[in-house]
């Protein structure tokens, strides 16, 4: 029992009656003898313990609690620290539809740094070299005709994990399968007019930047926001 007045209320119930009163007048719920609470509590023992005093589980728990908490995943840490470059190209349909600013804005909001930008009419030879891995495909001639049908905007972007992140921002090749929120998912409806190109690997990022930009056309600069994007 717990309470400020529990002792005063308990005592008259459980003490022996005065000598002049007979046993019939005793409270039927109490014994005439005084109750020794310390003895009663000492007699109580828990039926089980989660860990014995020196069990292996207890020692492991103590060791883990004293160690610094944290998870170290070196492969994730390494990927998070790699500053990469990727090539992004707004295709002729993206320019005709006035989407250049929208596309640049999405990459800037993500925190990537623009280090190269130019607009020009793509010659056929350059388009064929860029898409040479697709030269055996039946749609290759139409692809080259499409890319050379109007000016393109060439961009080089820099950032931590920029290649994979840019691919996610762009969305799947088929706009109808691209997730809402991606460039293609929001702004395109057909594979043949999917607005933008992005490098599919860090190696291709370097190759494509070297293909579309001449020496001296890239601008290396320090962003004032860098400390707010990375620790």
Curated annotation (Swiss-Prot):
Binding site for ATP: 91, 139, 167, 173, 184, 194
Active site: 197
EC number of the protein: 2.7.4.6
Gene Ontology BP term (one): red, far-red light phototransduction
Source taxon at top rank: Eukaryota
Enzyme class: transferase
A single GO cellular-component term on record: chloroplast stroma
CDD domains the UniProt entry points to: NDPk_I
Stored InterPro entries: NDK-like_dom (IPR034907), NDK-like_dom_sf (IPR036850), Nucleoside_diP_kinase (IPR001564), Nucleoside_diP_kinase_AS (IPR023005)
Post-translational modification: Autophosphorylated.
Disulphide-bonded residues: none
UniProt-listed Pfam families: NDK (PF00334)
GO molecular function: ATP binding; metal ion binding; nucleoside diphosphate kinase activity
Range annotated as the organelle transit peptide: 1-62
Subcellular location: Plastid, Chloroplast
UniProt cross-references to SMART domains, sorted A to Z: NDK
Keyword vocabulary terms for this entry: ATP-binding, Chloroplast, Kinase, Magnesium, Metal-binding, Nucleotide metabolism, Nucleotide-binding, Phosphoprotein, Plastid, Transferase, Transit peptide
Record's note on what induces expression: By hydrogen peroxide.
NCBIfam families cross-referenced by the UniProt entry: PRK00668.1
Function as written in the Swiss-Prot or TrEMBL entry: Major role in the synthesis of nucleoside triphosphates other than ATP. The ATP gamma phosphate is transferred to the NDP beta phosphate via a ping-pong mechanism, using a phosphorylated active-site intermediate. May activate MPK3 and MPK6. May be involved in the regulation of cellular redox state and hydrogen peroxide-mediated MAP kinase signaling.
Subunit structure: Interacts with PHYA, MPK3 and MPK6.
Protein family: Belongs to the NDK family.
Protein name per the record: Nucleoside diphosphate kinase II, chloroplastic
UniProt organism field: Arabidopsis thaliana (Mouse-ear cress)
Gene: NDPK2
